[in-house]
């Protein structure tokens, strides 16, 4: 939303430095985030850089307050600030990666007319089998038990919703600008891989869980690059991610930054 992070920017010098760094790398980002029109901020190429700065600013503020994470994860775009927090990427490189990601995913959203719907109250295997009945519909976000978001061709999404309802589930169409985390985004993954190969990649200093697998990130540089790049065109297995993070940990010590 317009104005997100503005209070922190005004009150926290480190947050201000972070936003100012983003502004120096991509002029106009801070104005769109703090003062722009809502329609402008919802454009993928603007949303992603603004969310990156806001996510990381609040995570760092918690750390400065003595609340340091021993494990992190992010949903979709949120995985990139989590990578910066975990020391896998420098803040500057992570922001540059987000700019590439947002720009390319925005372009592909224009190229491919996509739609998305949440499939509710059905087992994952039922939703997956229903997706296979269509040429270009895929499960993309495994959010929680009984809730899987599916995306793909805008021409097929209504029929997919009808098929979900026929099988006893609920289907809710979602207002999105593109079919993210589908094969439509393969070109974005390729662009990200090229960019990552020119960046310094470090082993995680804080345990970080990958959207694509729901498991901790690998330590090997080539595998880290592959995991980050393919995330844009792969399903987000967030239910598995949370289950694995909570294994052996207390839920009351979990913080969610949106």
Language-model regions, residue ranges each:
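Alpha/beta catalytic cores of group-transfer enzymes, especially the acyltransferase/condensing modules
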Residues: 23-30, 36, 86-235
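Glycine-rich anion-binding loop/nest that anchors nucleotide
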Residues: 243-246, 251-258
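Generic recognition of short, well-ordered alpha-helical segments
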Residues: 3-6, 187, 240
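FabD-like malonyl-/acyl-CoA
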Residues: 1-129, 174, 254-257
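A short, well-structured juxtamembrane/interface segment
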Residues: 236-244
């Amino acid at each position: 939303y317009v104005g997100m992070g503005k209070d922190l920017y005004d009150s926290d010098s480190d947050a201000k430095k972070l936003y100012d760094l983003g502004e120096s790398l991509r002029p106009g980002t801070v104005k769109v985030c703090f003062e722009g029109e809502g329609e402008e901020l919802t454009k993928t190429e603007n949303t992603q850089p603004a969310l990156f700065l806001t996510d990381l600013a609040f995570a760092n503020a918690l750390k400065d307050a003595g609340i340091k994470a021993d494990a992190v994860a992010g949903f979709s775009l949120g995985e990139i600030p989590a990578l910066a927090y975990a020391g896998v990427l420098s803040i500057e490189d992570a922001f540059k990666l987000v700019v590439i990601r947002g720009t390319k995913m925005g372009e592909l959203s224009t190229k491919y007319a996509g739609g998305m719907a949440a499939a509710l109250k059905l087992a994952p295997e039922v939703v997956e089998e229903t997706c296979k009945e269509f040429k270009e519909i895929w499960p993309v976000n495994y959010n929680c038990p009984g809730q899987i978001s599916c995306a793909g061709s805008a021409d097929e999404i209504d029929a997919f919703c009808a098929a979900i309802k026929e099988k006893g589930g609920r289907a809710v169409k979602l207002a999105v600008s593109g079919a993210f985390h589908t094969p439509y985004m393969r070109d974005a993954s390729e662009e990200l891989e090229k960019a990552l190969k020119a960046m310094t990649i470090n082993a995680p200093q804080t345990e970080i869980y990958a959207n694509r697998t729901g498991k901790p990130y690998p330590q090997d540089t080539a595998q880290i690059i592959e995991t980050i790049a393919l995330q844009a065109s792969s399903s987000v297995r967030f239910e598995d991610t949370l289950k694995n993070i909570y294994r052996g940990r207390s839920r009351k010590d979990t913080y969610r930054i949106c």
